[in-house]
């Protein structure tokens, strides 16, 4: 595929910035079998980008993905995915570093094995591993975490399953620079109950809720727990119109500061509309909001306190509270045209607003930039 874009307001700590971005992404995909039955798929893609006004060309980005499914047509089913990526790009949100290109490796693996113990019940085990490692010298914590779940389902009807599951996981934190403090291994425990399946002729999805505990055994007072949720439903308003709603609530550790817990709440709503009767035109639109509540954490450090009656700040060394609330609002919309199976054209717009509110006035608008970003992307995709 070939992608060209225009982006404004990328870095609010500097004057308004706009740039023309070009991306060429060759790739290849191999598949054995059909996704409706048993299959194995391998994909590779290389993204080559250029920021023309900034005169910056990030290192070529490489993406590999493997996905598969096996069903013995009796009682056993297995499915899983794995992706490995080398990415070199600017980063936004609560890991944004302003005008800095950041190289990083990521690995993400998910798998599930299900055994039908009867016509109405099944047992399953699932697992995941998430890994991210930033280049040396970046003041962000990477992590290497895995989680395993054991669950069971019961079908009161042919289309609906009620489930209960419990899980346990570990997260090791990776320091990209010695300036970052050491964080011991974090343990996470949780349990969910819920329902999934085809609720009506038009409504399907998963609705689950439970409780999650993130524990730092070697750090007194650093453990915390929250009610957790995982909701994902879709509604087919018409054959040509589909709405999707998702909400998740989960725990994590802050990427910038050792021992600081964070709770993320993410909500998204998307709509997909096929235009006309030929199926070659499609429009999409979406809105999402992610809030991050970072726990109170006091430490001795630098603060830039406002000077009353002026716009100036004074540097002081004192006890500061790193408690903060972040929010990310994203809007998107686009239209695509697919005159052939091997040819697709697209025009897309995206808006992103990131804001941060520190409890301590000496930290506000200093360490993390807030920003608005507008992106207009035009692309063509060629291939089978």
Give residue spans per PLM region.
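Gram-negative and organellar
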Residues: 1-384
């Amino acid at each position: 595929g070939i992608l060209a874009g225009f982006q404004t307001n990328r870095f609010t700590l500097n004057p308004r910035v706009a740039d023309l971005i070009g991306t060429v992404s060759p790739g290849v995909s191999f598949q054995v079998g059909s996704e409706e039955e048993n299959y194995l798929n391998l994909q590779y893609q290389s993204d080559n980008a250029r920021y023309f006004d900034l005169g910056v060309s990030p290192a070529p980005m490489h993406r590999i993905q493997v996905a598969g499914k096996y069903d013995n047509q009796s009682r056993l089913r297995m499915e899983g995915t794995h992706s490995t990526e080398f990415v070199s790009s600017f980063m936004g949100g609560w890991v944004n570093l302003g005008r800095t290109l950041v190289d990083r490796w990521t690995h993400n693996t998910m798998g599930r094995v299900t055994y039908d113990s009867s016509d109405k019940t099944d047992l399953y085990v699932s697992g995941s591993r998430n890994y991210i490692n930033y280049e040396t010298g970046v003041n962000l914590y990477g992590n290497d975490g895995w989680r395993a779940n054991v669950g069971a389902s019961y079908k009161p009807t042919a289309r609906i399953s009620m489930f209960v599951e419990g899980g346990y996981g570990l997260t090791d934190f990776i320091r990209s620079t010695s300036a970052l403090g050491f964080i011991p291994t974090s343990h996470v425990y949780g349990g969910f109950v819920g329902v999934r399946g085809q609720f009506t002729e038009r409504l399907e999805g998963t609705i689950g809720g439970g409780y999650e505990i993130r524990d730092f055994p070697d750090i007194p007072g650093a453990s915390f727990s929250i009610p957790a949720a995982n909701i994902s439903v879709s509604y087919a308003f018409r054959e040509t119109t589909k709405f999707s709603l998702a909400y998740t609530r989960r725990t994590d550790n802050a990427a910038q500061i050792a021992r600081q817990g964070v709770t993320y709440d993410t909500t998204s709503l998307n709509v997909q509309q096929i235009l006309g009767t030929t199926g070659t035109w499609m429009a999409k639109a979406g809105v999402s909001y992610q809030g991050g509540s970072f726990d109170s954490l006091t430490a001795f450090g630098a603060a830039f306190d406002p000077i009353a009656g002026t716009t100036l700040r004074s540097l002081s060394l004192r006890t500061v509270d790193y408690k903060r609330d972040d929010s990310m609002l994203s809007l998107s919309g686009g239209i695509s045209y697919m005159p052939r199976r091997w040819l697709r054209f697209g025009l897309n717009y995206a808006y992103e607003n990131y804001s941060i509110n520190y409890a301590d006035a000496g930290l506000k608008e200093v360490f993390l930039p807030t920003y608005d970003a507008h992106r207009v992307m035009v692309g063509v995709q060629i291939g089978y």
